[in-house]
A protein has these predicted regions:
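Short, charged early-sequence alpha-helical segments and their helix-coil boundaries
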Residues: 47-63
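Non-transmembrane, amphipathic alpha-helical segments
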Residues: 2-6, 22-29, 33, 64, ...
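Short alpha-helix boundary/capping elements
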Residues: 39-49, 70, 103-107
């Protein structure tokens, strides 16, 4: 693929075209289905834009919490096992902050218009 436009820019352009040009022309259930598709494209755009950085930050926090290295999925499995075994809990230094930041990062991708998420961003 060429350097410009990027994959993210292409997906955003398609979503914007559908939202601005096609949605107003469609009614009823088909308009609803089209909006679902547009929302999926918007989610993919956010995933491509935000996920790499938030995943790297999550992995760094997990490495510090657990004292081990590994892939993000393996680090999360290790944390889950330690929580299930009672080896770590919310009193463990850094765990609550890690869980909160991970949740906020995931909401930024999945549900950026979620009222509680937006309210929490406003509290910072």
């Amino acid at each position: 693929m060429q350097d410009e436009p990027t994959v993210t820019e292409l997906i955003k352009a398609v979503a914007d075209f559908l939202r601005n040009e096609i949605v107003p022309e469609i009614k009823g259930h088909n308009a609803f289905k089209l909006r679902v598709g547009i929302n999926a494209l918007d989610l993919v755009t956010r995933q491509l834009t935000l996920a790499q950085e938030s995943d790297a930050a999550e992995a760094a926090r997990l490495k510090q919490l657990l004292g081990i290295d590994g892939a993000l999925i393996d680090l999360n499995r290790a944390l889950s096992a330690k929580i299930a075994a009672g080896e770590v809990d919310l009193q463990t230094p850094g765990l609550a902050e890690h869980l909160w930041q991970t949740t906020m990062d995931k909401l930024a991708v999945d549900q950026p218009n979620y009222a509680s998420y937006k309210r929490e961003l406003g509290n910072k």
